[in-house]
Amino acid sequence: MSTREELEAKVAAATRLETSLRQQLDAMVEASRDDNADDEHDPEGSTIAFERQQLASVLERTRRSRSDAQHALDQLAAGTYGTCERCGRPIAPERLEARPDARLCIECARRG
């Protein structure tokens, strides 16, 4: 599978997951709206709030993953794929093989 195909597959998978997670989160919020329970005094309330927060966290990570893969596809189209966004040097092929959506070379990634 080519890098482009791999990135396109990652964008598609993340988009599907994002849609599913959004639906789950919306359903959870809607269900809690129908319930008049007070989370603070309901023994299940903190669990529901925790689950909602966990789901929102996974949704945000999925959005970032999709965005990173789309950014890499845009770089491919622009002819700048594989160039570190911080220092401008080439990103090692091994790093791109491990993380096709890498924006930074190893040295810049280590520096944070």
Could you tell me what each predicted segment is?
Residues 93-97:
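Short, non-ligating residues that shape and space the ligands of small metal-coordination modules
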Residues 82-85, 103:
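Cys/His-enriched microdomains
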Residues 1-78:
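Interaction interfaces in information-processing and related assembly proteins
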Residues 77-80, 101:
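Short metal-coordination and nucleic-acid-contact micro-motifs, chiefly zinc-binding Cys/His arrays
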Residues 99-111:
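Cysteine-rich micro-motifs
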Residues 64, 87-88:
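Short amphipathic alpha-helical surface micro-motifs
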Residues 86-87, 107:
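Short, cysteine/histidine-rich loop/knuckle motifs that typically chelate Zn2+
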Residues 91-92, 110:
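Short functional micro-motifs and their immediate structural scaffolds
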